[in-house]
Amino acid sequence: GCSTVVDGIFGPATEVAVEKFQGQHKLKVSGVVDSTTQTALLSPIAAVQLPISPGSQSLAELTVAYARQHLAQHPIEIGGQNCGPWVRLYMSGKEGAEWPWCAGFATWVLRQACRTLKVAMPHPYAFGCDSLASAAQSAKRLLRTKTAADLAAVQPGFLFLVRKTKTSWEHIGIVEDIQNQVLTTIEGNTNDSGSAEGFEVCRRTRSALDK
C-alpha cells in the first residue's frame, strides 16, 4: 500500500508513498504533492460531503443513506489514537487521545441529513455520549430497550447508545437495520470487535436489547 508513519517530516519514505499513490491513481509520478495529487488525496473526504437527493426519504432514511456514504470511504484514524483528517472532520478540528469521536461521527451524519431536508436537528451536534443522552432524555427522546416489546419503536436511522454504567454511556452509532432483536449499525471510532475506542467507521451487528 501507500501507508507510511506520520512523523511530521516529508522524508524519503513519504516521497516513495506519494509516488506509489500517484501511480495507483494514474497521476504523474513525481513524489511531489501538487494540486492534482492533493485533490486526489482529499477525494474520499470530499465524497462523503456530497449532497444526497432526498426524494421522498424521511430524516431517518436519509441519515442511513449518508451513513452508508461515509462507510463506503472507510474513514480511519491516521497518526495516532483519535487522530487524522477524518477525526478532525467529525470533531470540528479536534483530535487526540482525549477526543473519542463516535458521537462526533453519528451527529455529523445526522446533521448532514437535517441540512439536506432543511429541518432542525432532533439531537445536538455533540462530541460526548453522556451529553447526547442527557439532551435526548430532556427532550423525551431516550428510548430504553430492556424488553422485546420496547424494540417496536426502534427504526433505521435512530441513534443508539451503549451503556457504561447505570448513569453513563460509552459509545454511540447509527441504526442501519433491525431484525429479530438484532441491530445492524454503522459506527465511528470502533472496529470489528466492537470497541468504543476503535480506529474506523464500520458496519457492526449488535443485540438490540439493553441499549
Where are these regions (language model features)?
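...with weaker cross-activation on analogous glycine-rich loops/strands in unrelated enzymes
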Residues: 13, 57-64, 116-195
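Short acidic, glycine/serine/threonine-rich helix-capping segments at coil-helix boundaries
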Residues: 1-43
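Terminal peptide-recognition signature
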Residues: 18, 102, 106, 157
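Soluble non-cytosolic domains of exported or imported proteins
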Residues: 8-13, 31-35, 57-61, 96-104, ...
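Low-complexity, Gly/Ser/Thr/Pro-rich intrinsically disordered linker/tail segments
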Residues: 198-211
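N-terminal capping segments
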Residues: 38-119
